């Protein structure tokens, strides 16, 4: 894989102590599939993932979930507010698709204000261009 397409190690939370700081000092936000701990910092965007064996006993499935979430963060990291983001995956995420995981993570990030809201289609077009279908 091309190195520019990877999620760099410097953008990951690796140490147990860093996870504890995010858990204890960060704000917590929840959805049905994920729980997000956000700790604003002055440094770069960093991601930590927690997928326990309770989610799925098979490592293959846990790794699939982590890869999917890491890929979403890689694609949007430049848009995010700087800070540490720790994503804890819930048991309900075991049988969902990668697309559903992506939507769940993006909606949590929008809810906390770390990611700008999605643009509304045709928001900048004049009223008559939105509602008329001329041919």
Curated annotation (Swiss-Prot):
Instruction: Report TM segments.
Output: none
What cellular component GO annotations does this protein have? Answer: ribonuclease P complex
Q: Which InterPro entries match?
A: Ribosomal_Su5_D2-typ_SF, Ribsml_uS5_D2-typ_fold_subgr, RNase_P, RNase_P_CS
UniProt-listed Enzyme Commission number(s): 3.1.26.5
**One of the GO BP terms on file:** tRNA 5'-leader removal
Q: Which domain of life is it from?
A: Bacteria
The similarity annotation says: Belongs to the RnpA family.
Q: Which PANTHER family match?
A: RIBONUCLEASE P PROTEIN COMPONENT
Record-given protein name: Ribonuclease P protein component
Q: Please give the organism.
A: Xylella fastidiosa (strain 9a5c)
Lineage of producing organism: Bacteria, Pseudomonadati, Pseudomonadota, Gammaproteobacteria, Lysobacterales
């Amino acid at each position: 894989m091309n190195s520019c397409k990877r999620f760099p190690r410097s953008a990951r939370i690796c140490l147990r102590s860093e996870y504890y700081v995010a858990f204890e000092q960060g704000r917590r936000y929840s959805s049905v599939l994920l729980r997000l701990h956000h700790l604003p910092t002055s440094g770069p965007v960093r991601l930590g993932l927690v997928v326990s064996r309770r989610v799925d006993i098979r490592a293959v499935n846990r790794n699939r979930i982590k890869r999917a979430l890491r890929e979403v963060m890689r694609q949007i990291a430049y848009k995010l507010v700087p800070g540490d983001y720790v994503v804890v995956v819930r048991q309900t995420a075991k049988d969902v698709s990668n697309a559903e995981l992506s939507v769940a993570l993006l909606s949590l990030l929008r809810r906390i204000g770390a990611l700008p809201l999605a643009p509304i289609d045709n928001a900048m077009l004049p009223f008559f261009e939105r509602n008329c279908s001329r041919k």
